[in-house]
């Protein structure tokens, strides 16, 4: 079979999944060094420095618009599209594009929309999501070579993103207490506050709390009464958040988009897991550590704890996190 010369990749909607998908983008670029590789990204993500060799195409998430968007791609000469999200709408978009090769996983009624549709040979969420993505590149192979997620940032790009923000401390630790998915992934604010207090007392590092406007109230509670701890939640847009994390000495976070950004930056990080599984979404980063306390109900993947106790999270004590951070800062 002749290698394609013009490839399209439909990337995931969730920020964390998008960051993990950078591994797949890198693998495609390496496998097809002469091909144009364009990316379909959720609107709002087009400002990110994602690995590609062509154009970033932003789209609206609505199902009714997915088909129209796909139809607009029909005359652009693509020979192959990789469909990474598992949703029906993403496969529908690919089908409407009339691209000859539409490669993605079956499920959710998608088989007839894809050509070929790949049937997973494993149970859901038992392999790392990065491995699931990479398997689409070589579905005939039982073992897929692992490629780590990676964002390559130029100093010029970082400086440009930071230009509109207040001056950064010379050195800082970042805390990212948010998780859009839901509270079953969010380590308690009071625990973050205690860790921030101990870090502020025992280290010479400034501490910045990073997140979206929705995380601002949480950031205020964490920073309350602490010297050297600043709440930056809501101050930055997404590219600026990437730039901020690239300058952080270390990140403490939940299993979240920020966690996966830091993993793609290959920077030191500690992640706290709750309802999700490290087997599926741990940060693939040689400088990463994570804490996970499995309960009999783990992993449930719920947004909200069905038992209203989130023991998987609260059993990870601030002292556990402080010890890990101390080891990493030595």
What are the residue ranges of the model-derived segments?
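Catalytic machinery of carbohydrate-active enzymes
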Residues: 1-330
